[in-house]
A protein has these predicted regions:
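Conserved catalytic core of the tyrosine transesterase superfamily
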Residues: 1-182
Length: 182
């Protein structure tokens, strides 16, 4: 039997804060990695490409690895503040999420380990690197209810794909099933 890992968004905002605080007390780089993911909605492969010099402006310009599409986006104010604090004493050519071994970025596998451990410590399960992106999408949807905007951000081809990706479809299905009574 094949085991399928289902990766979920973090639906509870208090848990998002708890995980960030946990990471902040352990390692500033790792806390920023978490914040970057939940506030940008970028894939981990794109997040890990950032260098310190990419964070000096009021937003970012990136060509997404998976889609090869260009994106120009303003920083979220909370992320911008965290970035300013973190990069103040860093070399502009350094990777933002620098590995301890050399001037390379941490790997996707290391990012996964960081996120998984922090979430498990805070009793949040079914997580992976996509959890950050899905968390961004989930909470953005709850605020805006704008599926078209999220489709554009995520480069999805249909509303159904986006809603399923951010965990809204399953949540609605579960609520409906619980209400069923004969």
């Amino acid at each position: 039997m094949i085991k399928i890992n289902i990766v979920e968004p973090i639906r509870d905002k208090e848990k998002v804060k708890e995980i960030y605080n946990y990471l902040s007390n352990k390692n500033k780089r790792d806390a920023l990695l978490f914040y970057f993911g939940v506030y940008s909605g970028l894939r981990i492969s794109d997040i890990l490409k950032f260098k310190v010099k990419d964070c000096y402006k009021k937003g970012y310009n990136i060509r997404e690895t998976k889609t090869n599409k260009q994106k120009i986006v303003d920083w979220n104010p909370y992320l911008a503040r965290a970035l300013r604090d973190y990069i103040s004493d860093k070399d502009p050519e350094e990777y933002l999420f620098k590995s301890r071994q050399c001037n390379k970025s941490i790997t996707r596998q290391r990012a996964y380990q960081i996120i998984k451990k922090a979430c498990n410590e805070c009793k949040v399960y079914n997580v992976g690197t996509h959890t950050l992106r899905k968390t961004f999408g989930y909470h953005t949807y709850l605020i805006t209810k704008d599926v078209a905007m999220l489709m554009d951000i995520f480069n999805h081809s249909s509303p159904d794909i986006t809603l399923r990706y951010i965990g809204i479809s399953q949540e609605k299905n579960n609520q409906t099933i619980k209400k069923l009574k004969y």
